[in-house]
């Protein structure tokens, strides 16, 4: 893991800097899917939406409860109601959560904190929360921000709509490349702590060497695409991009 300027790491603790400031100088796991599936979208800012906001609030309740207190939400049945639109306008918000959505997330966190095994691991003495790291991987500079850094692992919190399918869908959502990138940046294996949003069932998912190798290969392919279209010496124009595959 490369030695980096402590000032950069301090800046990256701030979400604004991480996503829109100095953090833009680095690739991240969120770029993997874009580069491999639709590189024309690389670098295009993504608007906040329900999924992003729910995920952020879920993480804040567990990792940064002081920030969670600042969330603005409205007691409305849908986002098409007058009360919702007026609330967003009065608070200068492009989007906000509904009270029932906030309560659902609070219930999920209550289930997690009510499980002894989860609680002891998530809040173990010495754990560090929301820790950024940067480093060189396969010739490119990458960033990552760990939910929880323990003595011997990185814990990443996830929600899922179907925990029975989590291990089958993990590569689809690029959790394999996340495991590889974070292990390279932090020098520790990444473990997923997961809760099913529908049933409340909890699960712990640990990556195998094969899973991490899949992530390593995926990172290599993403770097090839980046260099082809966006590197210092690109060999093609992104406007020429198209998909060329065989059907089986």
Regions found by a protein language model. Name each.
Residues 62-67, 159-162, 187, 227:
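Hydrophobic/aromatic-lined pockets within catalytic cores
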Residues 124-127, 131-218:
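Mg2+/Mn2+-dependent nuclease catalytic core
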Residues 219-248:
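Polybasic (Lys/Arg-rich)
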Residues 1-143, 240-246:
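Metal-dependent nuclease catalytic cores that hydrolyze phosphodiester bonds in DNA/RNA
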């Amino acid at each position: 893991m490369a030695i980096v300027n402590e000032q950069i790491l301090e800046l990256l603790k701030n979400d604004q800097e991480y996503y829109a400031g100095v953090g833009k100088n680095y690739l991240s796991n969120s770029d993997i899917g874009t580069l491999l599936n639709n590189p024309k979208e690389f670098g295009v800012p993504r608007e906040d939406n329900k999924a992003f906001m729910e995920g952020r609030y879920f993480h804040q309740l567990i990792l940064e409860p002081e920030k969670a207190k600042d969330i603005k939400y409205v007691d409305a049945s849908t986002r098409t109601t007058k009360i919702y639109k007026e609330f967003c306008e009065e608070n200068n918000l492009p989007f906000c959560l509904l009270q029932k959505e906030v309560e659902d997330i609070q219930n999920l966190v209550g289930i997690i904190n009510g499980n002894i095994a989860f609680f002891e691991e998530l809040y173990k003495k010495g754990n560090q929360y929301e820790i950024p790291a940067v480093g060189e991987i396969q010739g490119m500079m990458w960033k990552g921000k760990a939910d929880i850094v323990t003595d011997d692992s990185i814990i990443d919190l996830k929600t899922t709509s179907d925990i029975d399918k989590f291990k089958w869908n993990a590569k689809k959502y690029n959790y394999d490349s996340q495991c590889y990138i974070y292990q390279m940046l932090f020098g520790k294996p990444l473990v997923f702590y997961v809760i099913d949003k529908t049933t409340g069932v909890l699960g712990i998912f640990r990556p195998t060497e094969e899973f991490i190798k899949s992530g390593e290969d995926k990172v290599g392919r993403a770097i090839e695409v980046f260099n082809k279209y966006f590197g210092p010496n690109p060999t093609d124009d992104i406007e020429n991009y198209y998909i060329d595959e065989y059907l089986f």
